[in-house]
Curated annotation (Swiss-Prot):
Its main location: host cell. Keywords: ATP-binding, Early protein, Host cytoplasm, Host nucleus, Late protein, Nucleotide-binding, Transferase, Ubl conjugation pathway, Virion. PROSITE patterns: UBC_1 (PS00183), UBC_2 (PS50127). Signal peptide: none annotated. The active site is at 85 (glycyl thioester intermediate). The gene is UBC. Belongs to the ubiquitin-conjugating enzyme family. One of its GO terms (molecular function) is ubiquitin conjugating enzyme activity. It catalyses: S-ubiquitinyl-[E1 ubiquitin-activating enzyme]-L-cysteine + [E2 ubiquitin-conjugating enzyme]-L-cysteine = [E1 ubiquitin-activating enzyme]-L-cysteine + S-ubiquitinyl-[E2 ubiquitin-conjugating enzyme]-L-cysteine. PANTHER family: UBIQUITIN-CONJUGATING ENZYME E2. This is Ubiquitin-conjugating enzyme E2.
């Protein structure tokens, strides 16, 4: 059963698309989202479009979702299998200076935090030891070539794996393409699993009559 919290978040992201990430969902399973994260500008990851999968547990939002990169990544806090090491996705038993998952978190803020992490690694909590070592050398200007070179490889590969449609999306992200839903709007599920909001014509006619008065 899909929680009302998750459904509400999904609808909100469809109504208010982000320039920083793109989501797509299989209509048969709303608990698994495919995500493309845009590499932050003015960073080594700029230009990359990195694919990831989010899996929501049955008790969401009281338990954190799991995010796994499916694109190849070179980052101190991303394991070789794509799993992510970030404090806000840790459960109650995590000991990350109190920065653990909270039911008040929204998935859009989580995704923005993940994007921010790309440019601000935590080498003291490495998931990829080799990447962490390389990043430290880059950070302390002992080796300014190796880390950027590996990151740029992943940027290029991510673009090679993206469709032309995905690349075009980030060039022309629609902003506020639909009005904020109100009682006058109804949900209509599309074949691809997304939702659109349709306006009740009868309500529109009533509004026009009131205006005429």
């Amino acid at each position: 059963m899909v929680s009302s919290f998750l459904l509400a978040e999904y609808k909100n992201l469809i109504v208010n698309p982000s320039e920083h990430f793109k989501i797509s969902v299989n209509e048969d399973n709303l608990t698994e989202w495919d995500v493309i994260l845009k590499g932050p500008p003015d960073t080594l990851y700029e230009g990359g479009l990195f694919k990831a999968k989010i899996v929501f547990p049955p008790k969401y939002p009281y338990e954190p979702p799991r995010l796994t990169f499916t694109s190849e990544m070179w980052h101190p806090n991303i394991y070789s299998d794509g799993k992510l090491c970030i404090s806000i996705l840790h459960g109650d038993n995590a000991e990350e200076q109190g920065m653990t998952w909270s039911p008040a978190q929204k998935i859009d803020t989580v995704l923005l935090s993940v994007i921010s992490l790309l440019n601000e690694p935590n080498p003291d909590s490495p998931a990829n030891v080799d990447a962490a070592k390389s990043y430290r050398k880059y950070l302390y200007k002992e080796d300014l070539e190796s880390y950027p070179m590996e990151v740029k490889k992943t940027v290029k590969k991510s673009l090679d794996e993206c469709s032309a449609e995905d690349i075009e999306y980030f060039k022309n992200v629609p902003v506020n393409v639909l009005p904020v839903p109100s009682d006058d709007y109804e949900d209509e599920e599309m074949e691809d699993g997304t939702y659109i909001l349709t306006y009740d014509d009868e309500d529109e006619e009533e509004d026009e009559e009131m205006d005429d008065e």
